[in-house]
A protein has these predicted regions:
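Canonical alpha-helical transmembrane segments of integral membrane proteins
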Residues: 1, 12-23, 68-90, 121-127
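Membrane-anchoring hydrophobic segments
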Residues: 1-39
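Membrane-interface segments at the starts/ends of alpha-helical transmembrane spans
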Residues: 2-13, 59-63, 99-119
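Transmembrane-cytosolic junction motif
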Residues: 24-41, 86-97, 128-154
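Short, charged cytosolic
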Residues: 33-55
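Anionic N-terminal interaction surfaces
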Residues: 48-66, 123-180
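Phosphoinositide-binding peripheral membrane targeting modules
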Residues: 176-210
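Acidic, Ser/Thr- and proline-rich intrinsically disordered linker/docking segments
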Residues: 204-254
Length: 254
């Protein structure tokens, strides 16, 4: 009866789904903040510049909370479906024996109550596949970026700048981590960027509109004097984007 009562509550699995996503975002934010405020092991601090930046910028680090949340939800949901569904089936079978006038078969009744958990399991499974794909793709992008920066012999000074800087700007956008503005470089953990100010040719503020043309967020669209990957830094507030743009252009040209 307890299990069937839980299954009958249509809010249990959706609530678990929402909670797992909330915790993933919460812990990802914590991980990023620790990196920006240099709260990591001495072993990491003592790595060579390229290894150091790869260690803190690799997607596995910032997205690990999502990966774990997705796996835990999939396990919890499948156990819920298998064991809870079986318990509910047995209970419904007993009722159908006592009350022969019940028109819905036990299997159909259970399937009807488990439709939402099954749909959420499928959604989370595809999110997990997407996460694994993004990790693989981002790993290559970060590695290529660091190799490109290393060609210009700037990773040593970038590491020094990263440790000496304490200017943290909040993006307040889910898909963009807070950024660190050093004396010579911009640092973003997610999406991973190390951008020398001297490479900036121009910065424009663009807007991504929300549904119905209202809301949305802003991003800095960079024009660079090097053949670097496109760089976009997102912010929830236009005022923040304008302040960062002004700071970057000042550093780039003065």
């Amino acid at each position: 009866m307890v299990m069937s009562g839980i299954i009958g509550d249509n809010f249990f699995i959706p609530s678990l789904f929402i909670l797992s996503m909330f915790l993933a975002f919460f812990f990802r934010k914590r991980i990023v903040r620790k990196i920006l405020f240099l709260e990591f092991d001495e072993n990491v601090k003592n790595l060579a510049p390229r290894d150091f930046f790869y260690s803190i910028l690799k997607m596995e680090k910032s997205i690990k909370s999502f990966y774990l949340a997705e796996i835990l939800f999939l396990l919890a949901d499948i156990l819920f479906i298998l064991f809870g569904g079986y318990a509910m089936y047995l209970e419904r079978l007993e009722l159908s024996k006592k009350y022969s006038y019940l028109l819905i078969s036990p299997a159909s009744f259970v399937l009807d109550h488990l439709t939402l958990p099954i749909i959420l399991w499928v959604i989370m499974f595809f999110l997990l596949l997407l996460t694994l794909f993004m990790i693989k793709k981002e790993k290559k992008r970060v590695s290529d970026m660091l190799n490109y920066l290393n060609k210009y012999n700037i990773l040593n000074s970038a590491k020094t700048d990263f440790f000496n800087s304490d200017k943290i700007i909040k993006s307040e956008v889910i898909l963009q981590s807070d950024i660190k503005l050093g004396d010579k470089y911009l640092f973003s953990i997610y999406t991973a960027y190390i951008l020398p100010y001297s490479w900036i040719k121009d910065v424009k503020i663009e807007k991504v509109h929300g549904r119905g043309g209202s809301g949305g967020f802003y991003y800095l669209n960079f024009t660079l004097n090097k053949s670097f990957n496109p760089v976009r830094i997102f912010f929830a507030k236009k005022e923040t984007a304008e302040q960062v743009k002004k700071f970057l252009l000042k550093k780039a040209f003065y």
